[in-house]
Amino acid sequence: MKNWTKVLSFKITAPAGYYNYDFRDPHVFYNEELKKYSMLVSTQTEPGRKAVLLHFTSTDPASGKWDVQAPIYTTTPQDNYLMMECADIFKMGNYWYLIFSENWSGNKGTHYRMANSISGPWTTPENDMIDGEYFYAGKTASDGSKRYVFGWTARKTPENDLGNKDWAGNMVIHELIQNSDGTLGTQAPQKVKDLFSKKIVAEVDATSENVTANNGNYTLSGTTNKALVTFKSIGKKAKIKAEFTLGKENGTSGFVFHTDSNGSYCKIVFDMAKGKIIGYNSISQEVTRMPFQFQANTKYDVEIITEGSVVVLYINGKAALTNRVYGREQNKWGLIAEGQNSTFSNLQITQPE
């Protein structure tokens, strides 16, 4: 693995009917069903310029001979994807999964499809997202018993909360969970959670009149006026853990970060009416979102793992939303309810030893 020799004669170009300029992101694996090596390549139809994942096979990759097969997946009229980038394919239990990233539709991020066979047909789950818009180019790997997905959290240009999403950033890792119906969920890897073993106190900075605090439990009565409790900075690396309940179908509740003396903040909130977890910047523009169906008066577990400006929120070990929040580590954070009554209980803060 240290010394490589470039084979100058090796070249694969797009077959007839496909766009040669965007013909990239090869993913090679040994296909147990075919007893051959398979290679996925991201490209587009030509004409038409619609996203497609081509499939090539080879009995001997070193020979440079790859035979084109029927496409693994072509974007549907409902998808209408321009490009499906950084594709990955794997089997988990009885299902095959196809993962790809898409950055041009109104639902940007890392998506997946599932099937009973590598040849399909591929079905789209009700929620086909692995994470929101700030987790991209997800690729997977297994340690033999668990499977993880690795993606990057985009930086912004300029590098502040109002900057535009740029390319590349910090790596974030989720553990993939297979639900009983075959759909996928995400949770924080146990090895990551174990790093945060030093307990610290959540120091209250300020509370609005409609917040009740009692030994790590907080009731936010924000139906009429915004309810907000803020805490002092928890530093560069920390994990926030709590249980929360939403009292009604309308309104939002969640967390605020990078609160400053002017009263501005970024927020990640739970929106039952929209069926989403949503990240907003400091001028209340939506920047990322993840579908999640909430129910009133139901308790949910939430974990937030932060390092620098990266903030990753997990709910019930089932869903994740990754965010970029500049200035978080130097500033206050808190809990918020707007048009909503909510409770946060057993609030715990831990840091690495």
Residue positions per predicted region:
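Beta-propeller fold recognition
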Residues: 153-210
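Secretory/extracellular carbohydrate-interaction modules
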Residues: 219-278
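Short, aromatic/His-centered strand-loop micro-motif at the edge of beta-sheets
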Residues: 281-301
